[in-house]
């Protein structure tokens, strides 16, 4: 085998290994939780989500009303059956209790992104439920 041919195979092998590395995942920090006395069985949660560069979410739903406010960077959000939207710091997004969140990712592969989510949900329900497509 010639050296250029070996080099090509080595490059291909390296690319295949990189493709097998999973994307970065989001970091979630709970900031606040409270029972909503005026709404029996409901609670409010406030979480901060940090996307490292290149991070993306799994397809999921919240079974909650979710109000998103972007603090830093740019993110792409898409609900099933709707177009994707790109949001930057200061912009907002809403997910309803029956929405399936098919895309949630950091636009940048070099800069982090952060956002706050206010969730109004049934008490004891998980904050996030993965959905199989």
Regions found by a protein language model. Give the residues of each.
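A short, N-terminal "cap"/entry segment at the start of jelly-roll beta-barrel domains
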Residues: 2-12, 16-45, 78, 93-94, ...
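N-terminal targeting signals for Sec/Tat export/insertion, comprising classic cleavable signal peptides
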Residues: 34-65
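Short acidic-glycine-tyrosine-enriched beta hairpin
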Residues: 36-41, 51, 81-98
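Extracellular/periplasmic catalytic domains that process cell-envelope and extracellular macromolecules
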Residues: 41, 61, 69, 86, ...
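Envelope-exposed proteins and targeting segments
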Residues: 45-47, 73, 114
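Histidine-centered metal-chelating micro-motifs
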Residues: 56-58, 76, 93, 97-106
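Glycine- and acidic-residue-biased ligand/ion/polar-headgroup-sensing regions
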Residues: 62-81, 91
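Ligand-binding loop in jelly-roll beta-barrel domains
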Residues: 84, 99-125
């Amino acid at each position: 085998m010639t050296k250029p041919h070996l080099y090509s195979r080595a490059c291909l092998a390296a690319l295949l290994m990189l493709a097998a590395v999973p994307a970065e995942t989001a970091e979630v920090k709970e900031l606040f939780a409270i029972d909503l006395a005026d709404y029996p069985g409901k609670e409010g949660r406030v979480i901060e989500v940090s996307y490292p560069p290149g991070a993306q979410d799994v397809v999921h739903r919240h079974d909650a009303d979710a109000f998103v406010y972007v603090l830093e960077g740019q993110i792409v959000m898409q609900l099933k059956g709707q177009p994707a939207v790109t949001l930057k710091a200061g912009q907002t997004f809403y997910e309803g209790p029956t929405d399936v969140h098919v895309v949630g990712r950091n636009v940048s592969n070099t800069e982090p992104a952060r956002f706050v989510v206010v969730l109004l949900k049934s008490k004891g329900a998980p904050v996030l439920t993965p959905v199989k497509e």
